Amino acid sequence: GNAGPNNVASAYAVAGFTQYACDVTPLMFCLPSPSYKAEANKGKMIRLRTGGNGAAWAPGAFGFLDPNKIKVDPDGPCAGLNGVKLDACLLGAIGGVTQCFNIRGVDIEPGQKVGIEDAIFNIRFDIYKSIMNGKKNDPDYAPAPNVIKGIVPKGGGSCIGQNEEISTDTVGLPRDDCFGDGTCDRFGTGVWANGRDVYVNTNYGGVHPSAAAAAATTRSAYYLAEIAAAGGGGSSSDILSGLSETGRPMCSNNQSADPDRRVVIAAGIDCAAHSIQGAATNVPVKEFFKIFLTEPVGDDGTSPPQLDIWGEIIGTAGGLGGGS
């Protein structure tokens, strides 16, 4: 199959001592506390920011699992690649990782890394620019079946590329309300009622697209309901009607049928307990988190760039700190 790091994860124990997680996105982030668990924080938003460059890893900082330690699928899109091209493939392509990561110890790298740009992540949202511009019609780099994001190509056309502007009649999924009023920093509360109202009023004239959407309490559930209401992941029927965005990919001529194209699996690490600075080896993983990307990744324009990944916790992808 073509199941990849962003749409499948599994965990298993070997001889009762060591647990592994397989086919995960090579991402890691620092937990706010040792007791922070995915299942207890479903529906809450996290803001992951580039971390680890010559400084202590703070809660909410993200980095990467060392790509040189990853066994690449010899039949997948990442075969034979190295350097930035390998990074881009492991983070952006559908399929390509066969390595199982030992939960008792992974090697990590800082998130601020030459060549790692927002473009690598944002192909999932039908945004193809910079080093990913040539991938827009490559099925291995297809966007998700729902790419509502509240931004559109500047000056018309179907591809955002390097030129984007805020949509005047659509909005992307909102952040937790506490981020807007400044009462939370990196880890949200899961309350997005105000943003939800704006989202439904702007995109749907105040009428939910389905009963499932009306009943959805999380952004990921709403996203899935939108896809289902428009005929599913394999359909090209518009999600939004008569607006600047259809909700379906308009730049790429491909579309992943799998809604999990906007899901990443990230290793949650208790960075404070291990006094990690910069790159580090053999760092224990508390748990692998499934995270739904709610909006395109932000890039501050520096070199190498600082990135912001906004996502909603879906639940656990396995781990829980070791043997079972």
Where does each model-flagged region fall?
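N-linked glycosylation sequons
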Residues: 1-324
